[in-house]
């Protein structure tokens, strides 16, 4: 893991086309602005985990429904 210190107004680059800038530093929070191509998906980690869990639950439900339907002929 790379750890980088940045001050308000400073940026870092990921590759050639993603720029992350520190826009505000408050008590207990840092506000970032992200400039990236529209093709790049940017999600907060907690939201990503929530979506991932919902997808797992949905897939499990789909399988049980298919098994029930398969049993009916």
Swiss-Prot record:
GO biological process, any: regulation of bacterial-type flagellum assembly
Locations listed in the record: Cytoplasm
GO molecular function, one term: mRNA 5'-UTR binding
Gene Ontology, cellular component aspect: cytosol
Record key words, sorted: Bacterial flagellum biogenesis, Cytoplasm, Repressor, RNA-binding, Translation regulation
Primary location group: cytoplasm
SUPFAM superfamilies registered for this protein in UniProt: CsrA-like
Taxonomy, superkingdom: Bacteria
Membership in a protein family: Belongs to the CsrA/RsmA family.
Quaternary assembly: Homodimer; the beta-strands of each monomer intercalate to form a hydrophobic core, while the alpha-helices form wings that extend away from the core.
Functional description taken from the UniProt entry: A translational regulator that binds mRNA to regulate translation initiation and/or mRNA stability. Usually binds in the 5'-UTR at or near the Shine-Dalgarno sequence preventing ribosome-binding, thus repressing translation. Its main target seems to be the major flagellin gene, while its function is anatagonized by FliW.
Protein name: Translational regulator CsrA
Organism field: Clostridium kluyveri (strain ATCC 8527 / DSM 555 / NBRC 12016 / NCIMB 10680 / K1)
Phylogenetic classification of the source organism: Bacteria, Bacillati, Bacillota, Clostridia, Eubacteriales
């Amino acid at each position: 893991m790379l750890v980088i210190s940045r001050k308000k107004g400073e940026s870092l680059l990921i590759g050639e086309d993603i720029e992350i800038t520190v826009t505000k530093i408050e008590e207990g929070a840092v506000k970032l602005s992200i400039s990236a191509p529209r093709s790049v998906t940017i999600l907060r980690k907690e939201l990503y985990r929530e979506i991932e869990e919902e997808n797992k639950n949905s897939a499990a439900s789909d399988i049980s429904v298919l098994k029930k339907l398969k049993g009916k002929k």
